[in-house]
Amino acid sequence: MYPADLLASPDLLEPLRFQTRGGVTVTRRATALDPRTALDPVIDALDRRRGLLLSSGVEAPGRYRRHALGFTDPAVALTARGRTLRIDALNGRGQVLLPAVAEALRGLEALAGLEEAPSRVTASSASPAPLPGEERSRQPSVFSVLRAVLDLFAAPDDPLLGLYGAFAYDLAFQFEPIRQRLERPDDQRDLLLYLPDRLVALDPIAGLARLVAYEFITAAGSTEGLECGGRDHPYRPDTNAEAGCDHAPGDYQRVVESAKAAFRRGDLFEVVPGQTFAEPCADAPSSVFRRLRAANPAPYEAFVNLGRGEFLVAASPEMYVRVAGGRVETCPISGTVARGADALGDAAQVLRLLTSAKDAAELTMCTDVDRNDKARVCEPGSVRVIGRRMIELYSRLIHTVDHVEGRLRSGMDALDAFLTHSWAVTVTGAPKRWAMQFLEDTEQSPRRWYGGAFGRLGFDGGMDTGLTLRTIRMAEGVAYVRAGATLLSDSDPDAEDAECRLKAAAFRDAIRGTAAGAAPTLPAAPRGGEGRRVLLVDHDDSFVHTLADYLRQTGASVTTLRHSHARAALAERRPDLVVLSPGPGRPADFDVAGTIDAALALGLPVFGVCLGLQGMVERFGGALDVLPEPVHGKATEVRVLGGALFAGLPERLTVGRYHSLVARRDRLPADLTVTAETADGLVMAVEHRRLPLAAVQFHPESILSLDGGAGLALLGNVMDRLAAGALTDAAA
């Protein structure tokens, strides 16, 4: 949104006077604010005053950094509907600027009409003329008016001054007309941009905030000494509003089937239909914004008071178009999976996403279309994919994202870059025009702002915009969330409908004020260890202290001693349980059998892990074998065959293994019962038929054994049953 070092620069605090390309004289002054509270007055005021706040709540090197910028009571508003753009002075300061704007528009060839009034200028663009595809963005449109305004105020050395606001979906039809089926409401606007003269900028990383104020001199006078202000435009709750969706049950699935038929005909490659969820909302928009920002930080966050009681609250994950110094960037997102219950669950979901052929195809098609968009306005050979299928995590979702760049060719500007991508394939489909016609024919309501963009058009020639998705539109007491899914030929109708609902979930919670819930934690182990003492025999192991920690979580008191000292301590300490740790080498290297004998002589229960199981097998006359390949740090599904240690656990568990030795099934002692095995029959757990002895070959303390809290639950059973003397009863 602005250079990373801007707020730290001493030059910003020095008054600056410059002249724009169109002859407007500008004076800039900046003052320091308390970064802890700088934005709060802006956010609170946006409940009733026109304005906007843009922020980024995430860090992604090379793509995003945390920052924020906001304002209220802008001087000028630019509003478009169809091919007409209205420019309004919102206060006395805006009235100083309006004559200069009118002068800049007089004689503009792209206009069919221009009306001037003291506080308003209305410009109507001419009908488009046929142009080569490379010049499509130069067709007469409301953007012709925007380009003239940008040229009037052009100031290459100021990175903050510009137009801020939102662009609606229907703007694309000025360049790609389609047959419109859906009736557009009378209050729909296609564009709303503000020209602010007071901005608050925050750099949370540097801990800096600045109020940046501008004064203007035009032929009509100076803004110096004129008050900032404007009318109230509050949100009006409606206690009679009802929740709902613009798709009845089964409707979206039928859209998916219709799309699949279009894919088979070759009409479409992909398409992204949406559905809108409505929630009554009595809370202030600022409250919804604060909840959403806290629960779902995103690269493109926005809170916009659009006037007329309409608001946007956004936490968009996707860059639309960013332009700086002639470099054009986009970050198309496609490929979605739900977050896991914890970090291990996330890892499994990331793997699922990255190995999904459908999700890979989704993003590939999006990026190929995106590259084509850039090729229209960029230098030959400059369009490159600089990031491929990168993972981004959000509160409920995991996405894959590409990063694409290009260099604008001579004669092209930021608006050309903006328009060539309208609208992003990630919210429309491909081929774009056919996809947009499909959306018009099958969606149940107009998109309004959804699928468009919001952000900044800079007077320095730059641009930073986010795609308008994961955005709440609030009006007349109702909050609306629209969400879509990318459909391909192999789409499952129910899964695509579920994806829409998943994408909308965090936003519906923010509307309702529903807490997302605390971060998931591992299930607590049974407290069977309360009051019990454990001696943990360390066989030079690298995981022994994690194992001790798990045992302590059962309430037990644990003492860890190296194998060379542990046996002598047995008689002195008389623990309630002896635990034989994993370790390198063979059981004989540590005389594990001797430790077991010493424990049995004292009547102490023994539990073994990995090497401990191998030592137990050898102690009772069994034999070990060497695996064809070591299994170190590998996850394995084991099948539970019974036994007290697995009481209450599922029949199949995923566990972590670190071993190259294994008990020979054909030489297993008759006194030992196998209670768990791998799919190919390898021994994974044993229990003694008469004595309080049990062991597992896998590592219950490994992160690979975290799934469902299996490792902790098993050790809870160890304390509850083995240490308590209940194991032999169960084994018998």
UniProtKB/Swiss-Prot annotation:
Give UniProt keywords alphabetically: Amino-acid biosynthesis, Aromatic amino acid biosynthesis, Glutamine amidotransferase, Lyase, Tryptophan biosynthesis
Q: Does the keyword Amino-acid biosynthesis apply?
A: yes
Source organism per UniProt: Azospirillum brasilense
Q: What is this protein called?
A: Anthranilate synthase
User: Which GO terms of the molecular function aspect are on file?
Assistant: anthranilate synthase activity
- Reactions it catalyzes: chorismate + L-glutamine = anthranilate + pyruvate + L-glutamate + H(+)
The gene from which this protein is expressed is trpE(G)
GO BP annotations, alphabetical order: L-tryptophan biosynthetic process
* Residue ranges of domain Glutamine amidotransferase type-1 in the record: 533-728
The protein's matches in InterPro entries, at most eight in alphabetical order, are given as: ADC_synthase, Anth_synth_I-like, Anth_synth_I_N, Chorismate_C, Class_I_gatase-like, GATASE, TrpE-G_bact, TrpG/PapA_dom
Superkingdom, natural source:
Bacteria
SUPFAM superfamilies per UniProt: ADC synthase, Class I glutamine amidotransferase-like
For this protein, what is the EC number? 4.1.3.27
| Amino acids binding L-glutamine | 583-585, 614, 660-661
